[in-house]
């Protein structure tokens, strides 16, 4: 019982650190898995192993999905005002290629970013 709670608290601490690092760095388009691992203080293999077991994603998938979820929130907030276009949203969340962003977004959410912005979901 004690080892389980220690493991759970260790996993929780790890995930809290992971979230803190991603929140601080996701806008940086040069922030990639190696930087992520270095900031958390673990090897790439350990990062991937732990994230896969805890949330079912590799480090690369986690970074991309985090960025896409933030982008989705930005698009939903910008529906009425249209203060940002899709390319600006892509750059804001750390993608440096709007076309790649659109492909990833569409695959993740089954709607294009512009479709979501224009209420076509």
Which sequence ranges carry the predicted segments?
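General nucleic-acid-binding
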Residues: 1-7, 14-46
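Short, Lys/Arg-enriched, Trp-marked, Pro/Gly-tolerant hinge/linker segments that flank
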Residues: 1-16, 53-61, 65
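Terminal helix-turn-helix DNA-binding modules in bacterial transcription factors
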Residues: 53-96, 119-121
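Basic, amphipathic alpha-helical hairpins
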Residues: 19-31, 51, 55, 73-84, ...
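Helix-turn-helix/winged-helix DNA-binding modules
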Residues: 10, 27-28, 39, 63, ...
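Basic/polar phosphate-binding segments, predominantly the helix-turn-helix DNA-binding elements
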Residues: 33-62, 90-112
């Amino acid at each position: 019982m004690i080892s389980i709670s220690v493991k759970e608290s260790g996993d929780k601490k790890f995930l809290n650190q992971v979230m803190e690092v991603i929140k601080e760095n996701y806008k940086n388009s040069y922030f990639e898995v190696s930087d992520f691992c270095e900031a958390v203080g673990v090897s790439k293999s350990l990062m991937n192993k732990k994230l896969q077991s805890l949330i079912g994603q590799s480090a690369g998938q986690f970074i991309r999905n985090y960025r896409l979820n933030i982008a989705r929130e930005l698009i939903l907030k910008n529906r009425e005002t249209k203060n940002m276009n899709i390319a600006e949203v892509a750059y804001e969340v750390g993608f440096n290629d709007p076309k790649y962003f659109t492909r990833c977004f569409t695959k993740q959410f089954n709607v294009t970013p512009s479709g979501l912005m224009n209420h076509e979901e």
